[in-house]
Amino acid sequence: METGTAPLVAPPRRHGAPAAPSPPPRGSRAGPVVVVAPGPPVTTATSAPVTLVAPGEARPAWVPGSAETSAPAPAPAPAPAPAVTGSTVVVLTLEASPEAPKPQLPSGPESPEPAAVAGVETSRALAAGADSPKTEEARPSPAPGPGTPTGTPTRTPSRTAPGALTAKPPLAPKPGTTVASGVTARSASGQVTGGHGAAAATSASAGQAPEDPSGPGTGPSGTCEAPVAVVTVTPAPEPAENSQDLGSTSSLGPGISGPRGQAPDTLSYLDSVSLMSGTLESLADDVSSMGSDSEINGLALRKTDKYGFLGGSQYSGSLESSIPVDVARQRELKWLDMFSNWDKWLSRRFQKVKLRCRKGIPSSLRAKAWQYLSNSKELLEQNPGKFEELERAPGDPKWLDVIEKDLHRQFPFHEMFAARGGHGQQDLYRILKAYTIYRPDEGYCQAQAPVAAVLLMHMPAEQAFWCLVQICDKYLPGYYSAGLEAIQLDGEIFFALLRRASPLAHRHLRRQRIDPVLYMTEWFMCIFARTLPWASVLRVWDMFFCEGVKIIFRVALVLLRHTLGSVEKLRSCQGMYETMEQLRNLPQQCMQEDFLVHEVTNLPVTEALIERENAAQLKKWRETRGELQYRPSRRLHGSRAIHEERRRQQPPLGPSSSLLSLPGLKSRGSRAAGGAPSPPPPVRRASAGPAPGPVVTAEGLHPSLPSPTGNSTPLGSSKETRKQEKERQKQEKERQKQEKEREKERQKQEKEREKQEKEREKQEKERQKQEKKAQGRKLSLRRKADGPPGPHDGGDRPSAEARQDAYF
């Protein structure tokens, strides 16, 4: 049987028989005690003093009947070790028993006793009588009182404590294995582990065994039907002056014989258990993250995914599709090339940068890419030591209390923030406190904590702080200010855009009277860090740092369109409660990484459309609610807008070095700078020889070359001349302005004359029309007054006159 070290199998010993020395087998070495016993293991604890064997002096037990130990040679007795009273935790690991020769049971009254083993693995030890957390395996028993017999074993009820090492489930034994029942292994600290039917706790005082209340525990031998128990025994540490150091011993390596000092950035065992009990108890319900037996500070390690999550809704496991290694390396090389010429790529080839961000930034370069995209890297370089200064400054107590209460709520299933008081929560506290001092008008908003936590998962605290500053100032200005007016305004913008993207979802939400702030506040303010799976969160953040807030609008529109955008999906959302429940439990398909990125990139929502809706909603806001109480800075849409603003804010270039090299300008420049004026150029005296040409005096150079021109008059003009020139330019601008005003007035008068002329023509036409109508009426009246022409005039007789002639 191989367990990493040579196994030691102890033969049974009858009750009351003295211990006899056992010869060690050839080639054996110290290792864990192996107890072969059928049935479930029983763990008991005792506080009686036991005999410890120093390392290198142990005599391992021998297997009776084996070929190597058939004729054992006598071995020298080990030197007695000092008796130590204490209690330890005994770890049981159940393994299947391999093929082994059947042990021979001694028939005599005496049987050899298994010797103590040196060099066993060190585990966490607790002082005798000290309080300890409950454990499933063994709880330290209190020191024996004056009325308690020393040799009486005490059984302790057990419960589970966070971080306790538990026994593995038993494995099926191999057929044909023979064991002996009732075998008992004695630990160096006084704990006794016995098999089924053996319940005696042994004492190492004078080689005598105490009275066994359960009687002899020797059982029959035969074929093994139980697993083999590998017992790892840990001696209690030696008494020290400071008993508090007992909680800081580590269990990360075998052979550690004494207590070690506590690391400055770690917690003691008791502190770790008391601080993390709530977190680990909640983690114990999630079986997807189980599977690690190693320990750190006494707490069992758990398997994490590649992002560091122990469990929870954002635990990804091994179901995600990974990018091929060669493709990942090619992408890394492309990003490194962009970093070397970042300004050129942003100004000239921004579309390529945007395409690569949509494909996903390599994990190894994501932190650096986010800093370049947000321009926080340059902000960090411009403010060296600013973060440390803010960290040392005293903060506002009202903000610090709220920040401290929110620390344990940020990603409790992530390995960085699982431990209360761990380095992750400490860095998060430093960042949020520094921001409240850096922006005292805004203070602290609870939605800033998850954003800062995501940044801390990728970069150090100082870099994460400046990246958070850029997010709050450039990408999402006003989101975290008092009153949350910016997020309310963006909610109205989002609802207007939803009418274009999904009219059915817009109509349903309006019918149910669900305000956008009820469901989109956490999405927008946390940038979906608490909503989407973690792989999708990182892809959304990659695009967000490159393209700005339009990515947040697009993601929210995609989620609503695929949640409430069809008649079938609305059948289960008949009321407000059902709709809100559906929005809290989004479909997994629409949150999947590739599907979400594809839908987001194809949604036609641009910066111009968002700004147009922003202007419309801002006008409506002012009409209904008045002016905004908080007026943030202008929102910048992505890294290119931030880059262009940075170029505009750069100071103009200074004068040319060729002008500064001239004496006159050098003198004025030094006087303007507050320094002593440079001496005037020396006056050359006339001589018989030809006069040398003027020289040019440059900074840091001796005059050696002749000037190409003979004029050494310094360039520029006096202050009065410049003032007159400015006055003349001002008057010229005023004259041009007056000329333009006169021209406008002349054009206005001309238009007025044309208008009057047209009006006059219109009136003339109307007058002529009226005159023509009047002439027509006069003519018709004259004709009526004159009557028709008579017969003598060639006309017809009137009908009345003809009728009168006919009557008479």
UniProtKB/Swiss-Prot annotation:
PROSITE patterns in the record: TBC_RABGAP (PS50086)
One GO-annotated biological process of the protein: regulation of GTPase activity
Segments of skewed composition (Pro residues): 100-112
GO molecular function list: GTPase activator activity
Composition bias, Basic and acidic residues: 719-774, 793-808
Keywords, in A-Z order: Cell membrane, Coiled coil, Cytoplasm, GTPase activation, Membrane, Methylation, Phosphoprotein
Entry protein name: TBC1 domain family member 10B
Gene: TBC1D10B
